[in-house]
Amino acid sequence: MKPFLLTLLCLSGWVAAGYYAWNSKAKNPEPPTHGVVIQPAAPPFQAVFEKWAEKPELEAALTALVLLDEEGRVVFSSALGETALCPASTLKTLTTGAAFGMLGPEFRFETKLIHRTDGNLALVGGGDPTLSLADLEQLAATAVAAGLKEVSGDLVADSSVFSAPPVNDHWNWGDIGNAYGAGAYGVNVGHNRMLVSFRPGARTGDPAEFLKADPDPPQTRWLNTVTTGEPGSGDGVTLYSTPGGRVISTVGTVPRGPAFSVRGALPDPPAVATAALRAALERAGVKFAGKPGLGVGELAVHRSAPLAEIIDHLHEVSDNLEAQCVFLTIGKVSGADPATAVRGYWEKAGVGFVGLRLLDGSGLARANMIRPLDLARVNLAARRGPHGGRYFQSLNPSLGGNVRAKLGGMSGVKTDTGFLTLENGRIYTFALMANGVGTGFDFWGLRDELLAAVRHAAE
């Protein structure tokens, strides 16, 4: 055979071999090497998650689960593990984990009573979300004990510690007048909540009479259209107000029967705080002249409980005000926008966010978005970071103590993130997110069922 023909045959063979190899890969492509790397343990978790996600209650929802081992390797990620979803209150873990690292567990909020050089007595807020009416009474007593007898000027509130508006632009209008949507001010009091009482009518559909609010917002006009609902129908009231406003609208229903109370947000907490403080001072004999004059400086300071204890409570009841005040304080201390400061903290800890929308510190904004993968990585970084053991302890226990986690929930959204302890003592970090969830079933019971099954499959 001539050399030319031999060469041609060899080339033909190579081309044919290359075509069949390409065709085989096209039909059976190799798994991608970018993104999340699934460890060999994924198959049992895949089956567990798919069986769970196929339940009729979840068939219309977007569901995702991510599991990380103690080294941060991805043990399992469901199909939506790298898709940004609404986190609800699990977003609080970005705030609280960063707070442990940036502020420290012993950080305390300070509220001061200062007699200024213009003669005014100033209640200077430090953003303490836990300041109470009893704390204001104690501030008054301390100031009187320090010799305060007369104020040449007036009593004023200084809330300038936070530059951000007290109510986030992304919070729902229907949330901000209700207790869980209370704004975050430099001067807060009683968690910025009031108890609003109504007297139902004799028949369903009758107007319900507005009785009182406690504490009573000063100089406030109430526009009440609440009516009487069926007996046992519960709290159907929504309150509408604006920060610093003097008009509160109440709509909805209260159940027929005895007087019924609902919780609402104070529209002007600094005004309520100064009114209460002035009353306490006047009861102690302090006179207010209301004229320019001289002051004597700082008279009293109230310090909050340590931050770690506030975070314990914040996680336990998912307190939006406490989370937002901590978030804004991180920004104040760092000298940056709070979202930038919190994000930067986690990025320095090795969390590479994709698709993150961090609009508040509490998760109340529905426009917040985070990938389940990133939510899990934040929690692992928090456990590994400064005071990680204290952070772990602050999360709510369940499943016989084998789970430590922060839950999140709002209409259509259920989420969960934290740590799952296996029978061999290893600890997985997890993030479970469900968006588009319906009503009429116990999601948290299903959540417990899933985590118990994951724990069993890990052995």
Where are these regions (language model features)?
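Positively charged n-region of N-terminal signal peptides that target proteins for export
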Residues: M1-F4
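Hydrophobic membrane-insertion alpha-helices, especially the h-region
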Residues: L6-G18
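Conserved serine DD-peptidase/penicillin-binding transpeptidase domain
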Residues: G18-E54, G101-F353
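A short, well-structured edge-of-sheet supersecondary motif
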Residues: E54-A79
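Short beta-strand scaffold segments in enzyme catalytic cores
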Residues: L65-L67, T111-I114, T417
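Residue-level preference for non-acidic, small/hydrophobic
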Residues: G72-R73, K92-A99, L155, V187, ...
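Small-residue-rich helix-loop
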Residues: V75-S78, H302, V317, Q324-E459
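Short active-site loop at a secondary-structure junction
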Residues: S78-A98, M102, I311
